[in-house]
């Protein structure tokens, strides 16, 4: 957990403010070399305080991503074909794993996180914290 915290802190220090629409991908790595890239700019929030957060797995998932697909070919959630919802948090956070396809027709996994946590305004800190909670359980 300490490694995750240090890496995410370093990434946040290098980030410009997330108020613009341009994607700001924060990379979080664990001891096994697996990485999650979090888009801190693409965070939506409704009047009810429901946060929608996007991130993408930048390592290969053998059962769903062909070995020929490089992490650099990862794409945003564009064409939705199948999904899996994982209820894993007491704070009603839902993880949705979506398989999408890049321009070459290769399947890639993109992750969406919906949280009913009590954040008034999403910040890079809260975004990374939510992803770290999920990553520590599932990576």
Task: Please report, for each region that a protein language model flagged, where it lies by residue.
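N-terminal secretory-pathway/extracellular module detecting exported/lumenal segments
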Residues: 19-139
């Amino acid at each position: 957990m300490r490694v995750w915290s240090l890496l995410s802190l370093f990434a946040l220090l290098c980030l410009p403010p997330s108020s613009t629409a341009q994607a700001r991908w924060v990379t979080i790595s664990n001891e096994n070399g697996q990485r999650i890239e979090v888009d801190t700019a693409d965070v939506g929030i409704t009047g009810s305080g429901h946060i929608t957060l996007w991130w993408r797995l930048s390592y290969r998932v053998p059962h769903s991503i062909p070995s020929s697909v490089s992490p650099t070919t990862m794409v945003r959630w564009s064409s939705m074909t199948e999904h899996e919802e994982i209820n894993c948090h007491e704070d009603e956070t839902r993880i949705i794993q979506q398989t999408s396809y890049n321009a070459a027709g290769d399947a890639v996994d993109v992750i969406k996180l919906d949280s009913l946590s009590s954040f008034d305004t999403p910040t890079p800190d809260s975004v990374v914290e939510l992803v770290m909670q999920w990553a520590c359980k599932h990576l």
